Structures are given as C-alpha cells and as structure tokens.
Swiss-Prot record:
Gene transcribed to yield this protein: ispH
This protein's pathway: Isoprenoid biosynthesis; dimethylallyl diphosphate biosynthesis; dimethylallyl diphosphate from (2E)-4-hydroxy-3-methylbutenyl diphosphate: step 1/1; Isoprenoid biosynthesis; isopentenyl diphosphate biosynthesis via DXP pathway; isopentenyl diphosphate from 1-deoxy-D-xylulose 5-phosphate: step 6/6
Keyword presence, Isomerase: no
Native organism: Vesicomyosocius okutanii subsp. Calyptogena okutanii (strain HA)
Protein name listed in UniProt: 4-hydroxy-3-methylbut-2-enyl diphosphate reductase
Reaction catalysed by this enzyme: isopentenyl diphosphate + 2 oxidized [2Fe-2S]-[ferredoxin] + H2O = (2E)-4-hydroxy-3-methylbut-2-enyl diphosphate + 2 reduced [2Fe-2S]-[ferredoxin] + 2 H(+); dimethylallyl diphosphate + 2 oxidized [2Fe-2S]-[ferredoxin] + H2O = (2E)-4-hydroxy-3-methylbut-2-enyl diphosphate + 2 reduced [2Fe-2S]-[ferredoxin] + 2 H(+)
C-alpha cells in the first residue's frame, strides 16, 4: 500500500498569522485573551489555544469591558468592530489580509454606488463579515447557486460588481460567475480572482493526487470551508474522500482493497496531524510514502507591529 502526500497542504499564510497573533497576545498580555469566533476552523488548533488561555466567544456581549479581543481570520462586520471598540477592548485583528482585500473592495464599490453581488455560503463567518462591510443593508446581495443568480432583483438603473468568499471551489464559483456575466453583461469584475492562492493551490494539488489515488483522507474540521471543498472535488471525480480531525476518525474499512491512499490537509490543519496519519498508515502496512510535487508557497503575512 502506498501513501501519496499532496503539495501544498495544511497551513496557509493567513492561518499562520492568525494563530501567531493569538499566541503573541497571550505572551504580551497574559491569559485570558478573548477571540471572536474560532480563530481558524480547526479543532486541534482551537483546543491548543484554549489550553494556553484563549477564550473563544461568538458574541462580543460575552466579553467583559477593557479586555484583549482578537478578531478571527474570517473577519468581522463593521457593527462587530464598533461594538468591540465600545467596550474599551484592546483589539488585534487576525483577519486574513486576503479577506481584508475583499472587505475594502466592497466598501469602495459602495462609495461608487455599485450593487455588490457576493458569491459565498450563507452563514459562514467570512460571508457574514463581508456582508457587514456595507452601511446599507441592501448594498450587497448574496448568491450561492445559479438559481440564486436567476432570482436576483436587478434594477436597470444600477451598476453591478461581484466578489467572492475566498475559500470556495474554483470550478463551482466559475460557473456562477459565467452565469452572472450572462445575466449582467456589464458587471464589474475584481482586478484579480478573490479565491485565495492557498485555496486554489490546495484544490489543484488534490486534482493531481486523484489521478493516482483510490481514496483520499483530508485533515480538516467539519466546519472548515476550504477542507470541505477538497472533499467535494475528490467526490466529483468519483474518489471516496473522508474529512477527519485526526487518526481517531479513521475507519480501516475505507482501505479494503485499496493500494494507494492520498492524504492532504485543509489550510487550517497543522502538519503534525498529517504526520500522525502517515505513522498510522505505516503501522497498517503502508510501505511507501511519496511527496507529490506541487506549487511552492513562500507567502508570509506579518503580525501587527504592536505584537512583534
């Protein structure tokens, strides 16, 4: 039995930065520090930070006055930002810079009187944050499917632009974009695709891996958007794919009659979990572990200067 490891996999620059911000804040201020939402969507990472003194909350109303508050990598709305300032918090923003870019684009388009169409998953914290960048509730319309595009209320006197959640499936997003262009030929496009580099690279790596694998294991938590997209890509190709938090979630029956197992990790899953899976598979009879070539990533996002 062979094990193929996707490249790139695991932590991206935005996740590295977000975790480092929490750890630096704990070192500077001591526990507790409050984090609005899970800083990244990974159980192993979140549990580790909890053990160091991070307190994760969904509502700023649950934070006492004058405490340290960190915004998660997914970003927050203007209203949440304002609410946090109002309780006298010391604020550190761990929003991924690529998400911040989308936020700034929404604000810029609003000032130019554009109606913004956001392609994303309803209820995802990144989407909630992006929707909340507009001071007008009807400035941004959310679409998830081509059917949503068909139902859009389009004013003839309005200019339109679109943007996307950064962690979507590239293929699925493109079909929605194509339909948007069909419905609104004059729609304004982002200067560059909003799907982040790490999302694209990890999806491309899975497509390569699937050419040689009989089953795919994806290290990633169930609430991780980018990890779920990796699973969906494999399943659309016709390869069984399993999203796991770690080796405790593995079922040996998945490998019955299988000679090649692909392994990857979502952008919020640490490499230590991948290596635990590799050791597990070696113990179960894997004789070869092969790193499959892919794009080399050298992007780094620095933490805020006050934490350096």
């Amino acid at each position: 039995m062979k094990v193929l490891l996707a490249n790139p996999r695991g932590f991206c620059a935005g996740v590295d930065r977000a975790i480092e911000i929490v750890e630096c804040a704990l070192k500077l201020h001591g526990a507790p520090v409050y984090v609005r939402h899970e800083v990244v969507h990974n159980k192993f990472v979140v549990d580790g930070l909890k053990n160091k003194g991070a307190v994760f909350v969904e509502d700023i109303a649950d934070v006492p006055n004058n405490q340290v508050v960190i915004f998660s990598a997914h970003g927050v709305s203007i209203a949440v930002r304002r609410q946090t300032h109002n309780i006298g918090a010391i604020i550190y923003d761990a929003t991924c810079p690529l998400v911040t870019k989308v936020h700034k684009e929404v604000a810029r388009k609003q000032k130019q009187n554009y109606q913004v169409i956001l392609i994303g998953h309803k209820g995802h914290p990144e989407v909630e944050g992006t929707l909340g960048q507009s001071s007008e509730s009807n400035c941004v319309q959310l679409v998830e499917t081509i059917e949503d595009v068909e139902r859009l209320n389009l004013s003839k006197n309005m200019s339109f632009s679109y943007t996307t959640q950064t962690t979507l499936s590239i293929d699925d997003t493109q079909s929605i974009i194509d339909y948007l262009k069909l419905r609104i030929p004059t729609i304004d496009m982002p200067k560059k695709d909003d799907i982040c580099y790490a999302t694209q690279n990890r999806q491309d790596a899975v497509k390569i891996l699937m050419q040689f694998s009989s089953v795919l294991l994806i290290l990633g938590s169930s609430n991780s958007s980018n990890s779920n997209r990796l699973r969906e890509i494999a399943e659309k190709i016709g390869i069984p794919a399993y999203l796991i938090d770690g080796i405790d979630n593995i079922d040996e029956l998945w490998f019955k009659g299988v000679d090649t197992i692909g392994v990857t990790a979502g952008a919020s899953a640490p490499e230590v979990l991948v290596q635990e899976v590799v050791h597990y598979l070696r113990d179960k009879g894997a004789t070869k572990v092969i790193e499959v070539g892919g794009v080399k990533e050298n992007i780094h996002f620095p933490v805020p200067k006050e934490l350096r």
